[in-house]
Amino acid sequence: DEAHEGTTTALGDDVIKNLVKEGNGYDTKFLALSGTPFNILKEFDDNIYTWDYVMEQQRKAQWDELHFGDSNPYDELPELKIYTYDLGKILTDKSYVELEDKAFNFREFFRVWTGDIKHDHKAMPATAQVGDFVHESDVWSFLNLITKDDPDSHYPYANEEYRNLFRHALWMVPGVKEAKALSKLMKKHPVFGCGAFDIVNVAGDGDEEERSEDALQKVRQAINGAGNDGYTITLSCGKLTTGVTVPEWTAVFMLAGSFSTSAANYLQTIFRVQSPCNKDGKIKRCCYVFDFAPDRTLKMVAESAALS
């Protein structure tokens, strides 16, 4: 399993050599399983079997027609919906655009002060502290934008209906320092800091005032504590994006990466939210991806389609 990682290492080679036996009556069958096999496809000229998300959803939709009366084993697998917003058009600072590929530069947008003028490219304002956002006013505007109470707005937290759809969400950010700064800012925000939202920072060791503990345990405790009326937002720069299931997550916000982000990492992350969830009699029917770099989204979808 996870063959795109396990079969590409020296340890993986040694394990395979010890297990696969040929001759003297032996004919070991080798099955490499992977949900994101982009880097190992070239090793297989044939005998490639694909079962992807689209096929799964087609089988789910056709089940009653083809197997009337039988329970649908795909019924609880949510439909994945991807929405894109172009932050590059909303935030016009040219430093947010990567020159090489014209994609939105999340690392610059969420850059924090280090106190080192060589790294910061300018003197840190007297009102700022090391670890604060360099572009704090723009990050604040972004938080306002996605929470603005407007009946015509289609941003994720613009009204109570949307907020209930994304009651438990995963936000991917560029790094540990950026996650800490965002957690601090969100707790001051009139919507995210109103007490209804529990901001769970699992990047690195989390926030200084919180004990370092198992990231998954922190998230599950927050979700359980939220009950039926509360919300959670998990901030991560990589944790909980592979080999982990948080069934209650219904949305992932892609606020990190670039146009050159690998399709394998991207898909591993977004499909965290597609895990089934049947809780208190409620089935998760849909899950959502919000990507704020549309060109990157199209590239990822195209690369994933190449597998089919």
Model-derived segments and their meaning:
Residues 1-31, 36:
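SF2 helicase catalytic motif II
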Residues 4, 199-307:
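Conserved RecA-like P-loop NTPase helicase motor core
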Residues 8-12, 46, 125-150, 178-179, ...:
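Phosphate/oxyanion-binding active-site loops and adjacent basic polyanion-contact surfaces
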Residues 11-17, 43-51, 185-189, 250-253, ...:
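Short secondary-structure boundary/capping segments
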Residues 19-27, 74-75, 162-164, 224-229, ...:
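Conserved catalytic network of the ASCE P-loop NTPase/AAA+ motor domain
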Residues 25, 29, 41-169:
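Interdomain helical connector at the RecA1-RecA2 junction of SF1/SF2 helicase-like NTPases
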Residues 35, 174, 238:
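Conserved H-loop
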